Amino acid sequence: MKLYIIQNLNSHWKNNSSKNIITKLAHKFNLEIPQYKETGKPILNTGYISISHSNQFLVVIYSNQPIGIDCEIIRPIQQSLIDKLKLDKLNPILDWCKRESVIKLLDDKSYLLKKELNEYYFETVSFNPLLCIVLASNKAIPTIEIIHLDSELNFINLTQ
């Protein structure tokens, strides 16, 4: 399982800007280029992929098992949203990321409103203290190889 963290050092990622960079990523690392369902979920013929972005970070996970990923810059969340979604009051960003990663795993937005997610496996990736990254799967999550790149796909850091 490989997690590519792509950092745009000059600005924030825009919606849909990920498709172009993922195609470049696939060419650079000899990976399959995803197709996209009508819902926007990326799919592969061989294996699984999930994508998320927040501000200057784009995260892409390639896996041989079903996987979902979410990343969020750690920031305050409005109390009204915490109450509406019944997010964990101590760590609402982590709770949000767990729900979003399950949404991406299952391609089902109803999981944003679900509090109990005990049937899934979660892995939190510690990469940057200002960024929350959560993986979700319906199977135990194996070791993750982290590859940190800049927006030109040059290596910044490789961690195993």
Predicted features by range, described:
Residues M1-Q160:
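Core catalytic alpha/beta fold that binds nucleotide/phospho-ligands
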